[in-house]
């Protein structure tokens, strides 16, 4: 018996767990009691509890000792004590995977399963199914069928749930129990009906027609179980998504009808299903939103929370649909449950008007200190969305964010605020100086290294372009004096960027950098020495290449290439063009967050997608000597429909003078094996097909890869755009679908694929230039050309910008892909690297009158990339 002071002991942490210091050997020794007669039920049940505790705590039981304990436990079936019998069932289930010859208890369990004691029958079914494998299942099939339709609900449910588990290993046997499951689905018991429907669905889930018939049958006759209704709603919504069904479908009508069910859980499940259906219009959402609106005033906190959480999700895509609930949501702002209040506020922030923002900010500030960091992050994300929606309100929102930044909080919370402030600075030029000033104050007392270095990077990028850049120097240099090495290194880089862009400040910056040369840390000293030497040259090209824009290569790729160079010494200097370019802009790489504690741990450099392709292609003898891989297409191109007999996807790999087309092929016919599979290509331009590398064998549903190597045009190197007609050729061998054995003889066949396009974007790799003007000056005007074009089919600047960026495959710089409102002129700045490692920059001036006129100026370190860009645009 538990004593009265046990609760107090539990709270104090002393003596609360009677099994805390159990030893496996002692417990197994105690298990010998099972062999004694007469059986002591209380003592034996206590020992079984200890064994179960050890197993669930992860204690390893050897096969021999587990088997001995299991066999001893089987003798306890001689006792009729109900508690001991239930403990035996639990022990059988837990030890079924550890002990050997557990089937010895089959007869005892079968006897209990078919006996008159109802309290034994359900657990006996579950235990029996746990020890039964696919070879023994047919022996108990008759008993299982009887149990499924048993009039005792606990027995029927046990059999149905056990059948569901058995589906994984014995699908064909369990499938024969469908008639019994259908009979159980008509039960008046809510759990039996629910479990029966679950079994029926999992048996038929791969047959869409059968699932549709099942839904139709049960929705027509109605269901008694609210759990069954919830499951049918989920099945129906999944079916709607898979079939991309119209909202006129009977399935949607069924889900909508469940909004009028008498059970709250069914009503909520239906509302949740509707709002989560892709492509739902505001009109179709209206009934679900109305139901959720009613739940907002429910006396049950769980219902209010569910409603406001779902409305919050709806507001992300359809804020206008939730506007009708604003009054109810405002009432929830003062809810005693802070989670509900926070969700209500963030939903209002997404749906509220511009005029209500000030009032909402005051309401939020009244309880921000009372909610957890997790919900504070939700509030910050809502404010970020609001800044994009109402840019004129950025001053009010930024002041609120700055007050939040000064409060106590964890890393994720502070990072969310900093992210939001930076996004406001990037979107609103007039907020830049205010935002930078507040961030300067924040890093004066910032405990998070990742955030401090990120803000210093931002100051180095944006600070020199402000009206009074010198005011930021004090804050940056304070970091050099007061912070640890990682932040000091970031501060040195930021100082160098000010010196590289402002000649008046250069002497002062050089003085500060000379002080940093004596730093204790190697990284800080090296950076200061490097930047000092570059800045003292007073050359814009050097500043742009080594300070303002830096390397655009993959850092893991650079590490691997340098390691390989040291392992295989060469008289030739290291060639930076052999390193793959960064697949993501470096600005994005720097902002990726890493926990501060993990920053100093050695990391294993993961191979990028392009490096994996590089290794795969280098292993093909025909591709030796092609040089480093320049670019792989970001997404494979589908050359067949997904439902056809052969599924072919192509990835384009670009080298300096060649292209390799990688065809990933899947044969979906189970009565055929394909051999010597190649894709024959016919180019429309001066490309030359050099060789085909076949996929030797393509069995059913096993992917294989073949390649086609082509040489780039030499006579007219500007003709890079090309259309290839593709035909897959192969040898077909018929095979037995069951065994997979193919015939010895085969026959030649072919399959026409979709045409494959090669565009200028396949020859240019995106590169981010943080300072486009510096990069423009660095490249110089030796190879500069300019032409004017009319885009007659395009009617807006936004459309023109989007089309140009996509067509050229270059990276928009300095947020020039964002077109300001109510403007009829815009300048788009694009940067990239042409195959061979040549920088290519494009400045495109756009003018909107009746159509869009575009003046394109291109610069490169070589003439060919400029000619190709202008020829492609023309």
From Swiss-Prot:
One of its GO terms (cellular component) is COPI vesicle coat. GO terms for molecular function: structural molecule activity. One of its GO terms (biological process) is protein secretion. Residues 609-874 are annotated as: Interaction with ZNF289/ARFGAP2. InterPro entries: ARM-like (IPR011989), ARM-type_fold (IPR016024), Clathrin/coatomer_adapt-like_N (IPR002553), Clathrin_app_Ig-like_sf (IPR013041), Coatomer/calthrin_app_sub_C (IPR009028), Coatomer_g_Cpla (IPR032154), Coatomer_gsu (IPR017106), Coatomer_gsu_app_Ig-like_dom (IPR013040). It is a peripheral membrane protein. Keywords: Cytoplasm, Cytoplasmic vesicle, ER-Golgi transport, Golgi apparatus, Membrane, Phosphoprotein, Protein transport, Repeat, Transport. This is Coatomer subunit gamma-1. The keyword Secreted does not apply. Pfam families: Adaptin_N, Coatomer_g_Cpla, COP-gamma_platf. The coatomer is a cytosolic protein complex that binds to dilysine motifs and reversibly associates with Golgi non-clathrin-coated vesicles, which further mediate biosynthetic protein transport from the ER, via the Golgi up to the trans Golgi network. Coatomer complex is required for budding from Golgi membranes, and is essential for the retrograde Golgi-to-ER transport of dilysine-tagged proteins.
């Amino acid at each position: 018996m538990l004593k009265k002071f046990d609760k107090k002991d539990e709270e104090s942490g002393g003596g609360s767990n009677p099994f805390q210091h159990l030893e496996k050997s002692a417990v197994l020794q105690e298990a010998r009691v099972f062999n004694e007669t007469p059986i002591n039920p209380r003592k034996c049940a206590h020992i079984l509890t200890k064994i179960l505790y050890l197993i669930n705590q992860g204690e390893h039981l050897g096969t021999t000792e587990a088997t001995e304990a299991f066999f001893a436990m089987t003798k306890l079936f001689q006792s009729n004590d109900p508690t001991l019998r239930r403990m035996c069932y639990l022990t059988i289930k837990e030890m079924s995977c550890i002990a050997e010859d557990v089937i010895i208890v089959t007869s005892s369990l079968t006897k209990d399963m078919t006996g008159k004691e109802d309290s034994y029958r359900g657990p006996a079914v579950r235990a029996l199914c746990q020890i039964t494998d696919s070879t023994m299942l047919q022996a108990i099939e008759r008993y299982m069928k009887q149990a499924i339709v048993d009039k005792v609900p606990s027995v029927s449910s046990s059999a149905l749930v056990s059948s569901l588990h058995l589906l994984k290993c014995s699908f064909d046997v369990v499938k024969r129990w469908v008639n019994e499951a259908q009979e159980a689905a008509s039960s008046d018991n809510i759990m039996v009906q629910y479990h029966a429907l679950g079994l029926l669905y999992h048996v038929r889930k791969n047959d869409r027609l059968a699932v549709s018939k099942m839904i139709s049958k049960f929705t027509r006759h109605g269901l008694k179980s609210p759990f069954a209704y919830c499951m049918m709603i989920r099945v129906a919504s999944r079916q709607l998504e898979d079939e991309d069904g119209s909202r006129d479908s009977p399935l949607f009508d069924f889900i909508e009808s469940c909004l009028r069910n008498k059970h709250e859980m069914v009503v909520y499940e239906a509302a949740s299903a509707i709002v989560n259906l892709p492509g739902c219009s505001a009109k179709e959402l209206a009934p679900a939103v109305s139901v959720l609106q009613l739940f907002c005033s429910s006396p049950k906190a769980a219902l209010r929370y569910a409603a406001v959480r779902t409305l919050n999700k709806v507001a992300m895509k359809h804020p206008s649909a939730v506007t009708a609930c604003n009054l109810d949501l405002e009432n929830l702002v003062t809810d005693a449950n802070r989670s509900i209040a926070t969700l209500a506020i963030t939903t209002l922030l997404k749906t509220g008007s511009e005029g209500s923002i000030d009032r909402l900010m005051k309401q939020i500030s009244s309880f921000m200190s009372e909610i957890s960091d997790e919900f504070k992050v939700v509030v910050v994300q809502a404010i970020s969305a609001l800044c994009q929606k109402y840019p004129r309100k950025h001053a009010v929102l930024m002041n609120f964010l700055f007050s939040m930044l000064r409060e106590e909080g964890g890393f994720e919370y502070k990072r969310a605020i900093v992210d939001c402030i930076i996004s406001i600075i990037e979107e609103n030029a007039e907020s830049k100086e205010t935002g930078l000033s507040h961030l300067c104050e924040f890093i004066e007392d910032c405990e998070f290294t990742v955030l401090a270095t990120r803000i210093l990077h931002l100051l180095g990028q944006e600070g020199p372009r402000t009206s009074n850049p010198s005011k930021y120097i004090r804050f940056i240099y304070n970091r050099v004096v007061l912070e640890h090495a990682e932040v000091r290194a970031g501060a040195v880089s930021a100082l160098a960027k000010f010196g590289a862009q402002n000649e008046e400040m250069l002497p002062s910056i050089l003085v500060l950098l000379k002080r940093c040369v004596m730093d204790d840390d190697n990284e800080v000293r090296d950076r200061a020495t490097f930047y000092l030497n570059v800045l003292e040259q007073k050359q814009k090209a050097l500043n742009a290449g080594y300070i303002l824009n830096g390397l655009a290569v993959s850092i893991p790729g650079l590490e691997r290439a340098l390691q390989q160079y040291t392992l295989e010494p060469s008289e030739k200097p290291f060639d930076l063009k052999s390193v793959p370019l960064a697949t993501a802009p470096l600005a994005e790489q720097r902002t990726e967050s890493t926990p501060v504690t993990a920053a100093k741990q050695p990391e294993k450099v993961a191979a990028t997608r392009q490096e994996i392709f590089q290794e795969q292609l280098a292993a093909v003898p025909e591709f030796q000597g092609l040089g480093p891989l320049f670019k792989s297409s970001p997404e494979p191109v589908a050359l067949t429909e997904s439902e056809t007999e052969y599924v072919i996807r192509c990835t384009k790999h670009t080298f300096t003078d060649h292209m390799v087309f990688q065809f990933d092929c899947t044969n979906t016919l189970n009565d055929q094996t394909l051999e010597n599979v190649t894709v024959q290509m016919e180019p429309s331009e001066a490309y030359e097909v050099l060789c085909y590398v076949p996929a030797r064998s393509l069995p059913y549903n096993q992917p294989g890869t073949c390649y086609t190597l082509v040489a780039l045009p030499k006579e007219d190197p500007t003709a890079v755009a090309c259309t290839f007609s593709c035909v897959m050729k192969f040898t077909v061998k018929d095979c037995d679908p069951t065994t997979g054995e193919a015939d010895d003889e085969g026959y030649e066949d072919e399959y026409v694929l979709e045409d494959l396009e090669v565009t200028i974007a396949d020859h240019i790799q995106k590169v981010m230039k943080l300072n486009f003007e510096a990069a423009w000056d660095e490249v110089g005007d030796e190879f500069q050309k300019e032409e004017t074009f009319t885009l007659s089919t395009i009617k807006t600047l936004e459309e023109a910008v989007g089309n140009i960026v996509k067509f050229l495959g270059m990276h928009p710089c300095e947020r020039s892909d964002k077109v300001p409102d109510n403007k009829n002129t815009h300048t788009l700045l694009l940067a990239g690297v042409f195959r061979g490692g040549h920088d290519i920059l494009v400045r495109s001036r756009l003018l909107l009158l009746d159509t869009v006129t575009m003046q394109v100026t291109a610069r490169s370190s070589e003439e060919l990339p400029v000619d190709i860009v202008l020829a492609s645009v023309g």
